[in-house]
Design a protein with these regions (language model features):
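Multi-pass membrane proteins that catalyze or facilitate reactions on polyprenyl-/lipid-phosphate substrates
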Residues: 1-278
Length: 278
């Protein structure tokens, strides 16, 4: 029963932190230090990534009309939604950098960089970057205010920022891509939406990679924990995505920058005082 409660808590953390620019993987790694699950290391590696599938389903449900590229309902319009197909090609372009590094160096990165101190440093650095870019953009008008206006060059640049998140836990995939978008003149709302859509192939691919590597030969209890975590992550993600899209219509991302810096300092303090072991 206790492990079920832990899976619920992990699902809540995933659902909240996957979409806010504060690093879901970083929070899960830190939470695991204080409340580890009584499961095999193999299952934990799968759980940490595959739980994200619940969060992906929330994006698919909320933005179905913006991402489904076929028209089955309106006979007066083309069957293929060319604007959505174009969007998906741009998303695939943005996926290339992280996909290449993930396939080649997944095991190395997992072994050497998934540490509390790395998470802390990246929390602070990206937090500072958010404060800087929001101050820098304060009097500027966004160059890209519609999703369809993102160019292939913009998509590739955002993809390079995503690569940083793929390498360093604590960066935040959503944080890195939103930050990249803001730096090249994409509006907050468009940067957030593109980030949500970009998560679909990236997180699905990461989950598939883990399943290919480790399989699903787990106990019934472990599979139950995975299912519970995914369902909770899905429900919480629905609420958080709606909140974020409403929030950034009137506010900037500074609050997340401050949160990251404060949390990063706390984690470093815990590390150097021996509270955290890695």
């Amino acid at each position: 029963m206790l492990e079920i409660v832990k899976a619920i808590l992990y699902g809540i953390i995933e659902g909240i932190t996957e979409w806010l620019p504060v690093s879901s993987t970083g929070h899960l790694i830190l939470f695991e230090e204080f409340m580890p699950m009584d499961v095999s290391p193999k299952f934990w590696n799968v759980f940490l990534v595959v739980i994200q599938l619940g969060a992906i389903l929330a994006v698919v449900l909320l933005f179905w009309n913006k991402i489904f590229p076929f028209n089955f309902t309106n006979k007066n319009r083309p069957f293929l939604k060319y604007d959505i197909w174009t969007l998906w090609f741009k998303i695939l372009v943005a996926c290339i950098p992280a996909a290449v590094i993930g396939l080649l160096f997944d095991e190395f990165l997992e072994e050497h960089l998934y540490k509390s101190v790395v998470v802390a440093i990246m929390l602070i650095l990206v937090g500072i970057a958010f404060l800087w870019i929001e101050n820098n953009n304060r009097k500027k008008t966004a160059r890209v205010t519609r999703l369809e206006d993102i160019s292939y060059k913009d998509a590739m640049i955002i993809g390079v920022f995503q690569l940083i998140a793929a390498i360093f836990p604590g960066t935040s995939r959503s944080g890195a891509t939103i930050l990249g978008g803001l730096m090249i003149g994409v509006s907050r709302g468009v940067a957030a939406e593109f980030t949500f859509f970009l998560a679909i192939p990236v997180m699905a691919g990461a989950s598939l990679l883990k399943l290919i590597k480790y399989g699903l030969a787990f106990s019934g209890m472990e599979l139950t924990l995975l299912a519970v975590g995914m369902v909770v992550a899905f429900i919480v993600s629905l609420l958080v995505i709606r909140f974020l899209m409403s929030y950034i219509k009137k506010h900037d991302f500074k609050i997340f920058g401050y949160y990251r810096i404060i949390l990063g300092i706390i984690v470093l303090a815990c590390f150097f005082t021996g509270v955290l072991s890695i």
